[in-house]
Amino acid sequence: MIKYTDFFELIDNGGNLPIAALFMTYGFDAELFEHHILPSFIGILDDPRENELRFRNQIALKLKEIPIGVISDSKQFNGGRTFLYDHITVQNETFHPKCYMLLFKEYLRVIISSGNITKSGLCYNAELVWYEDIYLDKSNSISNELQFILSFIEERYSLDNMPALKMIRKYLNKCEFNEAYPKIISTCSNKNVFNKVISELKNCRGNCKTITIISPFFENDREKEIESTLLMSFLNEVKNIYPKAKINICFPANKQGDKYIVNAPFGIFNEVTKKYKDISLFVVPREWEREDDDPISRTLHAKLIYAQFDNGYNLYLSGSINFTNNAMTSSISNLRNIEIGVLNYTKQKLILPNFIKVSLSNLEFVEKEETIKQLTCFINKAEYNGKDLKILFNSNKMVVPCKIYYNENLLLSIDNQIEEKIIKNFILKKPQDLKVECNDFIFYVPILIPNKEDIITDDLKLNFELDMKDIIDYLSGKYKSISELERMKRIVSNEKQDRNNEMLIFFRQNLQRFYKALLAL
């Protein structure tokens, strides 16, 4: 079984001074990020449900000091951003890593996971999480590859104006690198993950007894350059190195009657079990255990290749990499997915989930129906300079007619293909994204703000200094909560009402509230 780990404990600054953070994720839930991850990292203790205005004011002030960057896949973004932090969405390839880098004053925390920044990834799925803290006065084995990945991403996606990325790269430049395990591997290199894993298996000491492959997704597409499925190709390589190694293939399933319903392609398993008799199939049910041993239903989303050797060592690969062609065979020359994983060779054993051994006759393959049409994100950039909003379109991909909304209001209605549109005197409100509606699909585009330090949002205009009148009003029951009081103060401030005139107008009412408040004390 995989023990339950609270991801949010790794994000919490624990009293350490936060400097910058970069979050690279496939799916991105802005509400989850802004209400839980962001405040945990920058050190905001207020609950937005109890005091939303103060919560937003504190985060807005912190973001003036601490640069935050998010990179996610464009097709998986559903809008919802409300704070000034950098967010870039990737369109050219599938951006699939789950790598989170948190820079504190004393160290850099690197988290490599199978879980996205979504409610499913951080709260409900069964995921694997690996992390390491890098200190400047200690050598490490991962800083060089991380530096290479960030350099590649910065150049490929033109991230020259992302301060969080630059600050983390600057820190990595100071680190002392040592060639050892664990190693970071990615698809941002000339050698793909498939070949890297095979090379590592060849170079390990001892004989491999067992290899366990856990993946929520498998592919059975036969590409022209591959004579068999990816899984068969991998097993052929493994058996060539370690002929006696046993292979365990594990995948999620739901039990219905005497059958296990799976979405892993049936043909793959039929092919490999016919050729190799020492291959075992296992299903991972949706029943997991937490540390308190209370059963909890979780969907398997972890990815793992786990090789056990007769010398007591174990080689494992975890991270974002599914056992699919797009993930395992991508490289710079054939880049379909951006993936990041960690490869470790250690005597430490992993605690695996409860497996149920099955035969092919126990399985029933159900292919998921694609009900949603493929998105085409045709806006390259939406950039706000403090006065105007410039929208750049990819005319080759553009779908018309389309409508662009901001803050639930129609901003543009476009009937013909264009390359650029400038919205003069654009007023930035609370939402930080554009919503694009076409006939068949909807997508969201984050608004980029290069000069964030010059932008004063409503969250920064709030003043929470309460005077005697405010206290009297609150105690007398004029306001249901402190949040309502602060909201009214903001309205008064925005309307620039004169304080002296206001006190004259409401003198009698305030006097009545004063006596009422005395009775309440």
Where are these regions (language model features)?
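Terminal interaction modules at protein C-ends
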Residues: M1-L317, T324-L521
